[in-house]
Regions:
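Secreted/periplasmic carbohydrate-active enzymes, especially glycoside hydrolases
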Residues: 1-11, 15-19, 29-387
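Substrate-binding/active-site clefts of carbohydrate-active enzymes
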Residues: 339, 347, 351-357, 415-428, ...
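Acidic (Asp/Glu)-rich catalytic clusters
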Residues: 344, 403-407, 440-447
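Aromatic-lined substrate-binding rim segments of carbohydrate-active enzymes
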Residues: 375-382, 386-430
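An active-site-proximal structural segment forming one wall of the substrate-binding cleft
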Residues: 428-446
Length: 447
């Protein structure tokens, strides 16, 4: 019987099989998701050379209290005995594993709110944010730090060093040839923390909003804006402009829906770089949003979906169709100051809103949402129709504005300036400009 050697065939087949496995292993290293948010919530802080667990969102005062390192700051005269907290540096640390973000082409470390003066380090080296510095100095801005390519395999070490705000403010004040009545104005920080007639002085620091990695491959979809260009009794016309950042020429399907009904569906060819898309929707016989006491505060669910291969990116905002106008007409005694909603003048019955907690990170999570809802429900039940957010506090959390939308409460939003002379140098103004841009974009889709 003639014998045939199968070994060479097996060897060739095995080599092909090995190449096949290695090739697809390399390809599969790339994460199949468009976008992923990875929370960084397990942090520690150092006090007297010892590490303690920290809560994020949080602040140093609540972290000290939760670890029983201080007593209740609101009891008796403890406000005076706890002023040392705001006068020293505090260090927060965490670690993350490189495997958490492997497979993503783009990764940024994001602080949605960090209070206030801090330096950021990765593995002992300064981590630069998109403006080319590792220092942050505004609690009302989002700060983004692109991660470098040379991360360590395994554990990587993040460190946030908080610098005392009063020390910075005194140093800035000493540069002036005159004395200011308030030094707090040099920091873009909640003014009320420096003490007010209604509350104590607790100059705190910390990560008062979430901290996370923003990871993406191929495309990144930006927030859409709701632009109402026409509204009458028969129809409404809205545009939903947004941007998509693309690594290459790509095809995506863009769908825009209102309350689950599709009003726009197009296949779009993206170019490499930034792409502006502007879906337009026409809604027949829209129900209008009215302030409390005038009618129903009708809200629609506006949704944009971007389909890219098997991935779907989805973004939602609730919106009320309405017109709001401030009418100022010259008369015999000056100028009128009249709000007109959906063509009808409205008598404003308002309330002044100050922060609901001395430590504002306490308004995060379920407990904070419940408190927002209860306080705003009291405003609605008192027949009020407008809430003014005082400029000595903060730009509020998203839950606050959502409940105002639902309850028919107009919001008069101050920029955060109050009862002080503020610097006018170019650096300060540029910082405030970025703050204003970020907050306007964040809040613009509330009716």
């Amino acid at each position: 019987m003639k014998r045939y050697s199968v070994f060479p065939i097996f060897r060739i087949g095995f080599r092909f099989f090995l190449f096949f496995v290695l090739f697809f292993s390399i390809v599969s290293c790339k994460n199949s998701q468009i976008n992923r948010r990875i929370e960084l919530s397990e942090w520690k802080f150092t006090y007297e050379d010892k590490e303690y667990s920290a809560q994020i969102p949080g602040c140093i005062h609540t972290d000290l209290l939760n670890n029983q390192l201080i007593e209740d700051p609101f009891f008796g005269n403890r406000e005076d005995s706890l002023q040392w907290i705001g006068e020293r540096m505090w260090v927060y640390t965490t670690t993350f594993d490189k495997s958490q973000i492997d497979g993503f082409d783009h990764v940024e470390l994001v602080f949605d709110g960090i209070d206030t003066h801090a330096d950021i380090f990765l593995n002992g080296e300064p981590l630069m944010h998109v403006e080319g510095d590792n220092h942050v100095n505004n609690m009302f801005r989002q700060w983004r730090f692109p991660l470098p390519d040379n991360l360590k395999d395994g554990k990587n070490f993040l460190e946030v060093k908080f610098l005392p705000a009063p020390e910075y403010e005194r140093a800035q004040a000493e540069k002036l040839p005159y004395k200011l009545p308030e030094e707090r104005a040099f920091s873009r920080k909640a003014p009320y923390q420096s003490g007010w007639d209604w509350g104590p002085k607790f100059v705190t620091c910390g990560m008062w909003q979430p901290v996370y990695f923003d990871c993406w491959n191929d495309i990144k979809v930006g927030d859409f804006q709701i632009v109402q260009s026409l509204l009458n009794t028969d129809s409404a016309v809205v545009q939903l402009p947004f941007t998509i950042q693309s690594d290459r020429r790509e095809e995506v399907e863009v769908i825009a829906q209102i309350d689950g009904k599709t009003y726009y569906a197009q296949t779009i060819t993206l170019q490499k770089g930034s792409n502006l898309l502007q879906p337009q929707l026409i809604v027949q016989n829209p129900q209008l949003w009215y302030p409390n006491g005038m009618g129903e505060a009708k809200l629609y669910d506006m949704r944009v979906l971007v389909k890219h291969g098997k991935n779907i990116y989805q973004q939602n905002h609730r919106w009320g169709f309405r017109t709001i106008e401030l009418v100022q007409k010259t008369d015999s005694i000056g100028k009128s100051f009249e709000f007109v909603v959906n063509g009808t003048p409205i008598f404003i019955k308002g309330v002044n809103w100050i922060p609901a907690e001395a430590f504002i990170s306490e308004m995060s999570g379920k407990k904070g949402k419940e408190k927002y809802k209860a306080l705003l429900q009291d405003s609605k039940d008192s027949h009020l129709n407008m809430v003014r957010i005082w400029g000595g506090g903060i730009y509020e959390n998203e839950a606050f504005y959502d409940y105002c939308d639902e309850m028919g409460l107009l919001v008069w939003q101050d920029f955060i300036f109050s009862c002080a002379l503020y610097p006018g140098d170019a650096e300060f103004l540029a910082n405030v400009e970025k703050e204003a841009e970020y907050q306007v974009k964040r809040l613009r889709n509330h009716p």
